[in-house]
Regions:
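N-terminal hydrophobic or amphipathic helices and topogenic motifs
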Residues: 2-85
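Single conserved hydrophobic/aromatic residue that forms the stacking wall/gate
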Residues: 86-93
Length: 93
């Protein structure tokens, strides 16, 4: 049986990977915003936001996860991009 310390260490590793992926997502979103601005397109795309949430819900359901929790997480990521965009003119997604 795995002890508590080992499980916590594994959980910490997963948490750090999640943070790394969020960082990667933010960087990609920033690059998308730059491309949109150069093309004269609006940085906010409500259709894309909806698509992101639908894809997240579908994937969560396939993994037998609670979709509401995943939607909340994705909305936080989108909200983060919105606030960053407002502060520095970057895109959402």
């Amino acid at each position: 049986m795995t002890d508590l310390k080992t499980l916590r260490e594994q959980l910490t590793e997963v948490d750090m990977k999640i943070i790394d992926l969020i960082h990667q997502r933010q960087s990609l979103s920033k690059n998308i915003g730059s491309i949109k601005r150069k093309a004269g397109k609006p940085t906010r795309d409500f259709m894309r936001e909806k698509q992101v949430l639908e894809l997240a819900t579908s994937h969560a359901e396939k993994l037998n996860m609670e979709p509401d929790v995943i939607v909340d997480v994705m909305q936080l990521l989108i909200k983060d991009r919105k606030s960053t965009r407002l502060n520095s003119s970057h895109a959402l997604i």
